[in-house]
């Protein structure tokens, strides 16, 4: 029978090597596990054929395929000869597949495998055998290692505590070797006495090799939770922190990586590291040059500083901000830059660390990384820059950063756009150089496009609108910026933001932007056509009613709604209407909305800024005779006369101007009395002004200039409004620093004023306007 012949052939091939096979297994510390007794057994053939490798195929087809696979042709006799060779070496092929270690070196066995991607049947059958063999080997090795370690640990513990340092060194080396194998490593970590001895030896030794071996052992143990707990309970953290002062790089590496594993996975490790002085030691290591070592060290600092103010202050006191900024400026290793930017991000929300990072050049060091291909690095740098930017408005050398931020506004990543808009908003605050730079690199167009794309995402639209508000005021390119918003189709979307679902912070910023846009006469008609005036009046009425309701209920403190005071909305809307009222058609619309009674009522406001803008808008409306009569009919003369005595020069000036225009049709006696009243009120603190007025030269028609408002005025106050929201890591919000009120322009025409004696000299004698006082509309620090 063919199958029996095959089995006999296999048995004859295996017989001579049977003892060698058994011997080989015994040399590997194995006993005979049944391989010898089962050497001559095999499963019967399922096909019943003599040669299990043969297939029932057509011979001619085989010959055809054979010829296709070789460049030379074979005769029938040659094919039979080759087939015979394969039959004679069948046993060797089986042995090579299942027990390759039993073959003699150099033995050549013809292979039946023609395609490396398709193993033969014998090779496939041999795979489970090989897997079983390796499993048995691993199991026996593991058992041997565990038994050896268990027997050796008590003795090694004694040797580690020996007084002879040579003995201690040898024991440390042996323990280190044992810790490299998993079984013995588990045995070590389960012995508190051994772990304590390792920690004590590492801490007390003066021998470099002993320190290296003990630190290496703890490093190996720290890859297991059980090992981390054993190190923690044995007081390993203070010892490892001490090793951070070692001059040996390998010891430093073992110590910092072990501490890193503890900080990541062991409860209580953070506090232990802080108490042991680990923060100071880690900051001191930031001057090293090994980038991988620095990456681990900075990650440790991030873990320790996150959510812990005391740690942030310790890092600051240790010189951390400067060292971290130097790393960002010096290295290119992505992981190091990423871990360092994470530390800076955590520190950037600390009010003490923030200015230190900025002064160390943090803005300039982080900026170049915004074009890095690593998105995680870019995102961390953006968050950090966003948090730092409100403290960096006075920084120089920001041109490159500003250009990059404008480019990033076109990103498809919402987080990138959000951060870029926020940073631009803060950096353009009260910095005319930054404003001009952003305008010159296409910032207006980019910001308008950003607002258009953002839709109702206020975390993007609010900072973008704030940035536009800054860019349209108080710098040489401001008029160009005011025009550019219109030319890039921004007016419709800006006016739309005054409507729901916009929240009060966004509405406040939009009102300020509209006020600035109205400084450009070319924007008057488009803003009117977009319905800006009725909506501003609606917002004004609503905010005023809210303040009146609160006052009637006995409230004394100003109320915040979504972080915005309603008094700010009253002031902002009135100021925007004041500038829009420079256009005659806009004045008609404003008067037609029955706003004059409200403006007159605002003259009684206890807030000087509201008094000023109310008087300002009445001043513009009073240019029209009908409006002047309506103002007088509402009883405005009394409050305006009272405001002539205001300590705020802007309020007094506007009140005087309204009274001028209201007196146009009055008798001459009335005009003379008014002239005397104005003279005594406006020049009460300057008795010699009448003789000096010719040289003072107030330019009443200067667009956007403020009227007589000095910084030492008690009404010149600052406040903070909330930023654009906090991030998921507890980031502090960006602070938008703003002044309490803006300062209305004074470019109303004076040609039509009646002759009031010295009236023109009176107007010329006022202090010149300060163009840097438009505070409500451009955030001031």
Swiss-Prot record:
Recorded superkingdom: Eukaryota
InterPro entries: ARM-like (IPR011989), ARM-type_fold (IPR016024), Armadillo (IPR000225), Beta-catenin (IPR013284)
GO CC annotations, alphabetized: adherens junction; apical junction complex; apical part of cell; apical plasma membrane; apicolateral plasma membrane; basolateral plasma membrane; beta-catenin destruction complex; beta-catenin-ICAT complex
Single biological process term from Gene Ontology: anterior/posterior axis specification
Biased composition range(s): Basic and acidic residues: 734-745
Keywords: Acetylation, Activator, Cell adhesion, Cell junction, Cell membrane, Cell projection, Cytoplasm, Cytoskeleton, Glycoprotein, Membrane, Neurogenesis, Nucleus, Phosphoprotein, Repeat, S-nitrosylation, Synapse, Transcription, Transcription regulation, Ubl conjugation
Chain residue ranges for the region called Interaction with VCL: 2-23
Subcellular location(s) of the protein: Cytoplasm; Nucleus; Cytoplasm, Cytoskeleton; Cell junction, Adherens junction
Region of interest (Interaction with BCL9), ranges: 156-178
PTM-bearing positions, type Phosphothreonine: 41, 556
PROSITE patterns: ARM_REPEAT
Glycosylation sites: 23
Residues found modified as N6-acetyllysine: 49
Complexes and interactors: Two separate complex-associated pools are found in the cytoplasm. The majority is present as component of an E-cadherin/ catenin adhesion complex composed of at least E-cadherin/CDH1 and beta-catenin/CTNNB1, and possibly alpha-catenin/CTNNA1; the complex is located to adherens junctions. The stable association of CTNNA1 is controversial as CTNNA1 was shown not to bind to F-actin when assembled in the complex. Alternatively, the CTNNA1-containing complex may be linked to F-actin by other proteins such as LIMA1.
Functional description taken from the UniProt entry: Key downstream component of the canonical Wnt signaling pathway. In the absence of Wnt, forms a complex with AXIN1, AXIN2, APC, CSNK1A1 and GSK3B that promotes phosphorylation on N-terminal Ser and Thr residues and ubiquitination of CTNNB1 via BTRC and its subsequent degradation by the proteasome. In the presence of Wnt ligand, CTNNB1 is not ubiquitinated and accumulates in the nucleus, where it acts as a coactivator for transcription factors of the TCF/LEF family, leading to activate Wnt responsive genes. Also acts as a coactivator for other transcription factors, such as NR5A2.
Family to which the UniProt record says this protein belongs: Belongs to the beta-catenin family.
Protein name (Swiss-Prot/TrEMBL): Catenin beta-1
């Amino acid at each position: 029978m063919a199958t029996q012949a095959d089995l006999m052939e296999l048995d004859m091939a295996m017989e001579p090597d049977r003892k060698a096979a058994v011997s080989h297994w015994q040399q590997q510390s194995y006993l005979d596990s049944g391989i010898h007794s089962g050497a001559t057994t095999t499963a019967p053939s399922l096909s019943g054929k003599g040669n299990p490798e043969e297939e029932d195929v057509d011979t001619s087809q085989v010959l055809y395929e054979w010829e296709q696979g070789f460049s030379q042709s074979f005769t029938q006799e040659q094919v039979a000869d080759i087939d015979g060779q394969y039959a004679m070496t069948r046993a060797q092929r089986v042995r090579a597949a299942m027990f390759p270690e039993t073959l003699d070196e150099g033995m050549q066995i013809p292979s039946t495998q023609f395609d490396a991607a398709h193993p033969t049947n014998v090779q496939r059958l041999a795979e489970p055998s090989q897997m079983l063999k390796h499993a048995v080997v691993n199991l026996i090795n593991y058992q041997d290692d565990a038994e050896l370690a268990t027997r050796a640990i008590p003795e090694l513990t004694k040797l580690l505590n020996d007084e002879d340092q040579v003995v201690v060194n040898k024991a440390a080396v042996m323990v280190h070797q044992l810790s490299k194998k998993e079984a013995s490593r588990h045995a070590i970590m389960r012995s508190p006495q051994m772990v304590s001895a390792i920690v004590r030896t590492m801490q007390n030794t003066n021998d470099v090799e002993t320190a290296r071996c003990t630190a290496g052992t703890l490093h190996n143990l720290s890859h297991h939770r059980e090992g981390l707990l054993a190190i923690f309970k044995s007081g390993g953290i203070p010892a490892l922190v001490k090793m951070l002062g070692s001059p040996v790089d390998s010891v430093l590496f073992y110590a910092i990586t072990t501490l890193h594993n503890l900080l990541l996975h062991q409860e209580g490790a953070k506090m232990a590291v802080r108490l042991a002085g680990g923060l100071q030691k880690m900051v001191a290591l930031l001057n090293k040059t090994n980038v991988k070592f620095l990456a681990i060290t900075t990650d440790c600092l991030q873990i320790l500083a996150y959510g812990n103010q005391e740690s942030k202050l310790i890092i600051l006191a240790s010189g951390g901000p400067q060292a971290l900024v130097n790393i960002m400026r010096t290295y290119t290793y992505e992981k190091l830059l990423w871990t360092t930017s994470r530390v800076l991000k955590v520190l950037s929300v600390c009010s003490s660390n923030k200015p230190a990072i900025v002064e160390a050049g943090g803005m300039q060091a982080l900026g170049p990384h915004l074009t890095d291909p690593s998105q995680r690095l870019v995102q961390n740098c953006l968050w950090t820059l966003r948090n730092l930017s409100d403290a960096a408005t006075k920084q120089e050398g920001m041109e490159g950063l500003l250009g990059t931020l404008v480019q990033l506004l076109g990103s498809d990543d919402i987080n990138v756009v959000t951060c870029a808009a926020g940073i631009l908003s803060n950096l353009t605050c009260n910095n005319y150089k930054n404003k001009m730079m952003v305008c010159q690199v296409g910032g207006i167009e980019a910001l308008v496009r950003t607002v258009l794309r953002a839709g109702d995402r206020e975390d993007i639209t609010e900072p973008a609108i704030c940035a536009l508000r800054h860019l349209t005021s108080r710098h040489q390119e401001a008029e160009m910026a005011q025009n550019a918003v219109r030319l890039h189709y921004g007016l419709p979307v800006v006016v739309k933001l005054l409507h729901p679902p916009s929240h009060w912070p966004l509405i406040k910023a939009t009102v300020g932007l509209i006020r600035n846009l109205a400084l450009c006469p070319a924007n008057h008609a488009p803003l009117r056509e977009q319905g800006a005036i009725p909506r501003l009046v609606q917002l004004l009425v609503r905010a005023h009613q809210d303040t009146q309701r609160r006052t009637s209920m006995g409230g004394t403190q100003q109320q915040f709604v979504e972080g915005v005071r309603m008094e700010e909305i009253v002031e902002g809307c009135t100021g925007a209407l004041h500038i829009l009222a420079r256009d005659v058609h806009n004045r008609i619309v404003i008067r037609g909305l029955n706003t004059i009674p409200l403006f007159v009522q605002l003259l009684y406001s206890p807030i000087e800024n509201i008094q000023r803008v109310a008087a300002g808008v009445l001043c513009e409306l009073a240019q029209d005779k009908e409006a002047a009569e309506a103002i007088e009919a509402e009883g405005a003369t009394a409050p305006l006369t009272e405001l002539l005595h205001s300590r705020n020069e802007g309020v007094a000036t506007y009140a005087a101007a309204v009274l001028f225009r209201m007196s146009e049709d009055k008798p001459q006696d009335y005009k003379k009395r008014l002239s005397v009243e104005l003279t005594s009120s406006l020049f009460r603190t300057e008795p010699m002004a009448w003789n000096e007025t010719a040289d003072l030269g107030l330019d009443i028609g200067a667009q956007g200039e403020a009227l007589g408002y000095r910084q030492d005025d008690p009404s010149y106050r600052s406040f903070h409004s909330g930023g654009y929201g906090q991030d998921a890591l507890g980031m502090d919000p960006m602070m938008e620093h703003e002044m309490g009120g803006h300062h209305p322009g004074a470019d109303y025409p004076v040609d039509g004023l009646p002759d009031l004696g010295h009236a023109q000299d009176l107007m010329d004698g006022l202090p010149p306007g300060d163009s840097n006082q438009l505070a409500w509309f451009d955030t001031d620090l």
